[in-house]
Amino acid sequence: MLNLKPPPNLVQNAAPAPRPATTEQRAVNPANYALVRDRVQQRLLAELSPSATRDDTMEVRRVIEKLFAEVVADLGLPLSRTDRADIFDLVLADILGFGPLEVLLRDDNITEVLVNGPHHVFAEHKGKLVETEIKFRDNDDVMRVVERIVAPLGRRVDESSPMVDARLPDGSRVNVIIPPLALDGPSISIRKFPKHALSPDELIKKGAMTPGIAEFLKACVGARLNIVVSGGTGTGKTTVLNALSSFIPEDDRILTIEDAAELRLQQPHVVRLEARPANIEGKGHVSIRQLVVNALRMRPDRIVVGEVRSGEALDMLQAMNTGHDGSLTTVHSNSARDTLRRVETLVLMAGMDLPLRAIREQIASAFDLIVHLQRLSDGSRKIVQIAEVQSMEGDIIVMQDIFNFVQTGVDAGKVQGYFTATGVRPKFYEKLETAGMNIQPSTFMPTEPLRIRR
């Protein structure tokens, strides 16, 4: 279990640790603690303006402090200064924030928060998924946090609509599913939005790639190759896509298309598009595919699709094959080769009756490079494979690995290994030269293992 204890005020089903009683300070027993907490919450929920947000402005905080003092006085219970502060912080989190989850959402070392009913809250801490000591009182307590998440978005979660995708004010992605579909109580999955996008240099420092690989990828983006970033869930695909996007020249017109906006491009000429779910009446849905089609009419130099997961794969291929070179996207898959099979399946989801060979020809013509990521057993994330998509031979798409990460073992829980070129110079090397990208042929020669220990 993660040794990340929230303060007593954030453990919803526990009283604070007993303190020695004196004439001026007495310990608050669990019953009194729960009474104070519930009365304060009820009073504040009834009297606080519905327009209050989790921004925690001084004005809203003063209102909460005033009502809190009145409730404590009405109850007539002696509270120590520490107990008073703990209860106040809890109420503040419940009213303006997300209750016991606040401590996790504010921790920069936490990247994902997973709630499995009221009594099991997990967090991804520095790449490892562990259970925390945070708990809710009951299912209703979890649902209050759910309502706090979806209400500002005009969404609802109930038996008729038991699943919802949402986004927190800071950009973090949220998925909620409730009973009767979730058998053990409401489930909340939060993927936190990083405060800043990792640069290529930061990825190098974290051991995700080498400086040589970064220079190669920079040249590929500069030469307007079409690149697919692939990997499983939580491998860092969006992070790497952000880093690759930083190599795009500032004078290019870039259109980004996402299901939930996560990309943070710094170039001046960026148009950000985001898909929209249907409203409560089931109307107004705008899909990624519709946005990709519309983007082609907006004179883009580059199209960056956050993730291809359905029929928009066909439109993305057509865009790449009709003059929109230098496009970038991500795909869920288990390897570079599996990425091609995955895209084949996604194209078929477009509903077009296309022969499999025709789809493969489109893929082979559109994709230049696949950058595959993996989360290793120690929680680290690395680019483990960079493969060139070359051509068709018969009915098979020919691929060739350019770089690999070779794992040699595990030492004290840390993955050991090294990055290496495969000794094969990509067929698009001349295209890099024509674009003025200075990549030495020696870049593609296997070298002495550069051992990475992170």
Regions flagged by a language model, labelled:
Residues 258-271, 295-394:
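Conserved P-loop NTPase nucleotide-binding/switch module
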